[in-house]
């Protein structure tokens, strides 16, 4: 069996979050991980960026925009069956607001390049 070491790339750098992981699932607010002993780990605001079986590693990327993006994607998929567009509009508004917040923060930190 192949067990994976899991790292997360954050704005602060790379951190190891789990070892001997045999299960990973992207959920709306986190990535759920389970190791060979059944212990569970949740990494918030993240998605799976790389799986490298040869190196027995799984990499996650963490950002505050991931959850609003996944909520928007989920709403878009759900509207096909529910025919309720309201949730799409609300989640799109939330995603744009989070994107604006991140862009403003980066602009304050680095300014505009000429």
State what each model feature region is.
Residues 112-114:
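Long, compositionally biased, intrinsically disordered regions
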Residues 1-15:
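Eukaryotic proteins' extreme N-terminal regulatory segments
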Residues 65-110:
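Charged/polar low-complexity intrinsically disordered segments, enriched in acidic residues
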Residues 15-73:
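Compact, glycine-rich, soluble single-domain proteins
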Residues 11-18, 89-91:
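Short low-complexity stretches enriched in small and charged residues
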């Amino acid at each position: 069996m192949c067990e994976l070491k899991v790292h997360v790339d954050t704005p602060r750098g790379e951190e190891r979050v789990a070892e001997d992981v045999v299960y990973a699932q992207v959920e709306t607010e986190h990535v759920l991980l389970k190791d060979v002993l059944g212990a569970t780990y949740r990494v918030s605001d993240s998605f799976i960026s790389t799986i490298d079986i040869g190196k027995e590693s799984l990499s996650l990327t963490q950002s505050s925009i991931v959850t609003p993006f996944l909520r928007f994607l989920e709403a878009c998929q759900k509207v096909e069956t529910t025919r309720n567009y309201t949730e799409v509009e609300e989640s799109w508004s939330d995603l744009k607001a989070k994107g604006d917040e991140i862009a403003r923060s980066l602009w304050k930190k680095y300014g505009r390049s000429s």
